[in-house]
Amino acid sequence: AAGGLLAWARRRPVLAGVLLGLGAATKLYPLLLLGPLFVLCLRTGKLRPFAKTAGATAATWLVVNLPIMLLYPAGWAEFFRLNSDRGADPDSIYNVLRSFVGWPNWAPSTLNLVSLVLFAAACAGIGLVALTAPRRPRLAQLCFLVVAAFLLTNKVWSPQYSLWLVPLAVLAIPHRRALLAWMTVDA
């Protein structure tokens, strides 16, 4: 994911897409970075580089995944089945709220919908701010916000997910003290 952002910064949209596609083939979160790229390209009116990046991302993801999808369809789909059938992790915001508010355990399908709606609403808010801000936000700032929104609204929380935010935080948070404070609290 970080390599994809670097390639984008160096104005190499196809390479950015290939690197994001490879990242997405191992863990889906690099796909989240396409949203901020789209919003910034929309803001500047330059959608062609985004189209190249998105196309290269999809093509790379397919090249990596298609053989496994065709040869071992049940094994390939297991990740998606597991994630759609699982409930809230003990460390997720939903489980924390449930323990304080006394919410009942939600069925996985309900939790999936709630998580998706909250994440989509957060992304819409981030996109609106990005499109209407007086100064164009930096890509790393938007990526940090989108990935953080995904982690906060997701029903699954693993401590290693914080590592997804580290390179984005280093690029997005300009003040070292604020960055170190965030990293200390997160640890």
Region locations from a protein language model:
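Transmembrane helices and adjacent periplasmic/lumenal helix-loop junctions
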Residues: V14, V18-L40, V63, L152-Y161
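Membrane-interface transmembrane helices that cradle and orient dolichyl/undecaprenyl
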Residues: A2-L15
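Perimembrane helix-loop-helix junctions
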Residues: L32-A59, L70
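Extracytoplasmic catalytic-loop and juxtamembrane helix elements of membrane-embedded
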Residues: I68-R98
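Alpha-helical transmembrane segments of multi-pass membrane proteins
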Residues: A1-L5, Y29-L32, T57, C143, ...
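C-terminal multi-pass transmembrane helix bundles with aromatic-rich, positive-inside signatures
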Residues: P174-A187
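Aromatic/glycine/proline-enriched transmembrane-helix motif characteristic
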Residues: R86-T153
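Hydrophobic/aromatic-rich transmembrane helices and adjacent perimembrane loops
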Residues: S158-R177
